[in-house]
Design a protein with these regions (language model features):
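A short glycine-rich, Lys/Arg-flanked "PGG" loop and its adjoining helix->strand segment in the class I
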Residues: 114-129
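A short His-aromatic
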Residues: 105, 109
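A C-terminal cap/extension of S-adenosyl-L-methionine-dependent methyltransferases
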Residues: 180-244
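Short, glycine-/aromatic-enriched active-site segment of Class I SAM-dependent methyltransferases
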Residues: 10-11, 130-152, 156-164
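Conserved N-terminal segment of class I S-adenosyl-L-methionine
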Residues: 1-96, 100-104, 115-117, 202, ...
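Conserved S-adenosyl-L-methionine
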Residues: 168-178
Length: 260
């Protein structure tokens, strides 16, 4: 992404309703689908300005990768975590080391999404899991996606196909950012009709509005963790390596969590 996008992210990711609400949803998902209850070794790929690291540290120790120099320096200063630079598959990582690898709105930036997941698979310890969050609904493609250097938006089927091709078995897949979907669709289509680029989406609204949107979005965690939303602006997915894929254990070997 461009430098100004990271700078803007650094300004808003602590308080903006989308970032706060998403962290609440992902916290619920991790509480339900982490591979075990004790402290985990976690890798965040594409940590950006570090807004997710404190949330992830609730579940264990966190390593992180971020290729952008500005974002990496900002994240390291704000979190105290040593963050590796570079791009997959060239970043040196230990094999069979991590209990949890997360890519939170990152996979859509990577031209070879399957190749990236294949490179990460052997880095998971036995029983380890992969957690993804990605933008959904290709029909919502807009100037916002272009500004953020997205390669694609996913459907449930295209995301699962990439995950399967990379050697993973899906344990839970859920849409989220569902309650605000009608409003977001309306704004995106209005911006398209008026030729706007959609930059207002990265601004924090007035405090009462921001507070309400934070509450509404974050409240989805109770439904999203069960995979009950049929559609949404985003998709989250939890997966594990399949038998013979070179890492971890398959669902047939006891690594699968309860499926609701």
């Amino acid at each position: 992404m461009e430098r100004h996008v990271y700078e803007r992210m650094a300004e808003i990711d602590r308080d903006h309703w989308w970032f706060v609400g998403r962290r609440r949803i992902l916290t619920g998902l991790l509480e339900r689908w982490r591979p075990r209850k004790d402290a985990l070794k976690i890798l965040e790929v594409g940590c950006g300005t570090g807004g997710n690291i404190a949330m992830l540290q609730q579940f264990g120790t966190v390593d992180a990768i971020e290729p952008d120099d500005y974002a990496r320096a900002f994240a390291a200063e704000r979190t105290g975590v040593e963050i590796k630079g570079g791009y997959l598959p060239d970043v040196p990582l230990k094999d069979a080391h991590y209990d949890l690898i997360v890519l939170l709105d990152v996979l859509e930036h990577i031209p070879d999404d399957r190749g990236a997941l294949e490179a990460l698979r052997p880095k998971l310890a036995p029983g380890g899991r992969l957690v993804l969050a990605v933008p959904a609904m290709p029909s919502l493609w807009s100037g916002h996606d272009v500004a953020h250097h997205h390669q694609r938006r996913y459907t449930k089927s295209t995301l699962e196909a990439v995950v399967k091709a990379a050697g993973f078995h899906t344990l839970r897949r859920t849409a989220f950012n569902t309650l605000l979907l009608p409003a977001i669709v309306g704004v995106r289509w209005l911006n398209k009709a008026l030729g706007r680029k959609g930059g207002d989406e990265d601004r924090i609204p007035p405090a009462p509005v921001n507070g309400f949107l934070t509450w509404l979005f974050g409240a989805e965690r109770h439904v999203a963790v069960r995979g009950l939303f049929p559609a949404g602006v985003s998709i989250a997915l939890v997966a594990e390596p399949v038998l013979g894929s070179g890492s971890g254990i398959s669902s047939d070997q006891g690594g699968r969590g309860p499926t609701l």
